[in-house]
């Protein structure tokens, strides 16, 4: 909801298909990861583009329409060991650090006009009572 205004200004369609799920992760950490990823997607999507948030095969994903140049910047943020890459904001550095600290698997897939970021959140084992 925090990004609705910016998304409206840029005519970006946001489709949130996330459902309530239990995960074994500090809610504050999860909120920080998601808010930074969504903020980045809104800021770097093409005018009139889209952002789609959902789950697929146990992975949470955020997909957004963006240029190849923006995809390069995003990839550099996650492949450099420090915050050296030009154009990589503090938000993505924080996301990478949190994901690695929490040992959360992540990857992304690129295409000509969009990027999809995936992360595998630790699930609560329903049989561990």
Identify the meaning behind each predicted range.
Residues 6-15:
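Short conserved segments within the C-terminal catalytic ATPase subdomain
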Residues 22-29:
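Conserved micro-motifs of the catalytic ATP-binding
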Residues 41-42:
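Short helix-loop "hinge" at the ATP-lid/N-box region of the Bergerat-fold HATPase_c
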Residues 48-58:
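Short beta-strand/loop element within the Bergerat-fold HATPase_c
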Residues 61-85:
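Glycine-rich/acidic phosphate-handling loop/turn and adjacent ATP-lid/helix
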Residues 85-94:
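Glycine-rich phosphate-binding loop
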Residues 94-103:
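Conserved glycine-/histidine-rich ATP-lid loop and adjacent helix of the Bergerat-fold HATPase_c
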Residues 102-111:
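Glycine-rich ATP-binding loops of the HATPase_c
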């Amino acid at each position: 909801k925090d990004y609705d205004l910016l998304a409206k200004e840029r005519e970006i369609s946001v489709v949130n298909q996330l459902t309530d799920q239990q995960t074994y992760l500090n809610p504050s950490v999860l909120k920080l990861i998601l808010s930074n990823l969504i903020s980045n997607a809104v800021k770097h999507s093409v005018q009139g583009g889209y952002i789609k948030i959902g789950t697929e095969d146990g992975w949470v994903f955020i997909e957004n329409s963006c240029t190849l140049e923006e995809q390069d910047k995003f990839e550099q943020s996650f492949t450099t060991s420090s915050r050296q890459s030009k154009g990589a904001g503090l938000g993505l550095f924080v996301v990478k650090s949190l994901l690695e600290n929490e040992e959360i698997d992540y990857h992304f897939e690129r295409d000509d006009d969009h990027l999809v970021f995936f992360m595998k959140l630790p699930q609560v084992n329903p049989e561990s009572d």
